[in-house]
Amino acid sequence: MPWDDFLAAQGRFSPDPASDFYNKYPVDIDLCQRFGINGIRVSIAWSRIFPSGTGEVNPEGVAFYHELFATRNKAGVIPYVTLDHFDTPEAFYQDGGEGFLTRTTIDAFVEYAKFCFAEFTEVKHWFTFNEIPATAEGSFIVGNWPHGEKYRLDKAFQLMHNMMVGHAKAVVAFHEGGFEGEIGIVQNLEPKYPLDPNNAADCEAARMADVINNRWVLDATFRGHYAADTMEAATKLAHIAGGELDVRDEDVAALTAALPYNDCLGVNTYKCQFLRAAEGENDINHNGTGDKGSSRWFLKGVGESCVREGVPTTDWDWIIYPEGLYDLLLRITNDYPNYKKTYITENGMGYKDDFEDGFIDDAPRIDYMRQHLAWILKAIDGGVNVDGYFVWSLQDQFSWTNGYNKRYGLFYIDFETQARYPKASAYWYKNVAETGLLMA
């Protein structure tokens, strides 16, 4: 994605140096070893391998990733590698290109994936994409990502569909190539609840929101097609936005071909959404500052996002409802029984950490993780196959839409000096990793 130009035009903040993992990864891997972290996620920047998206390979980029993966494997910090984590090359947005809305990008992605599978055989855990629904939402619903369009549900669904076709083709290529390891996809999945479960209109609002965020990509992954009511809802919302969907027979064939080969599903989960039915025009405001109460979410054809009384929220208005993760995992198991296993690939709390004399007391983050892990254990007891948990995140970092004040890390970063400091949550997490017990 053309993030550099997009962020420069906004003028809010710069993505440099962020956490500088490119240069600091030996330090971060050492922290992993010291604090009981045996696996972390990392992505390959497509344009570091193919600067123009296709064609000539950059040998320096290839060498860097070999070194990174070797260092991590030697340290016992296993790499779980994503091929495209919000950074589709800018080349696909030039000369009239619209990223994955342009179908030739699908084929380019598959060729890039094939190269990586063959080149980086030391990697045994692959994900194709990170958070396709978030990509669509930021690009075409909220409009705070490049493309920067708002309320275009037609383009949002089309983008997700095209990316899912790319995922499916890459998954088939991985298995046809006989590569060792596993492959899946990471999605940001978010439970949707009616504000009043006894109100049919609220239930319908929650169902429509669920199609946007969850069912569209889950159907594509585990059904190999879109269920009739899923397609009906998506088509309705596309028409409200003034567009049509282009779902071709050969696309469905590609999704179907991948069905046996989706080895795992990565679930990124932070919050849920309560919805009520409402009539009116679109009105969404993203809270990217931490000014609590400033977010709005009203989507025509869906409804309005609300806060249920007694349910806490973060300063960024994200609803804290750990039980929702349990509901989500059981739902995946019940609705898509052909799934094989899940990883919780992101879970954590954005917080305004206070740095005082080298110590960061982030008790709310500890409480957040403890509650979510407890519900994960309950889901496992209920028959869900959860094979791993990745806290988001290892260290504080730059956020595309929030800048630097929304910190997620177990390790605090002084962005001026790049020094790392363990937070209270890092010590708590170390204890959990070493004992297997959810300590208070």
Please place each PLM-identified region on the residue numbering.
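Active-site region of glycoside hydrolase catalytic domains
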Residues: M1-A9, S52-T54, V62-A440
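N-terminal structural segment of carbohydrate-active enzymes
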Residues: M1-N58, V62, L68, K74
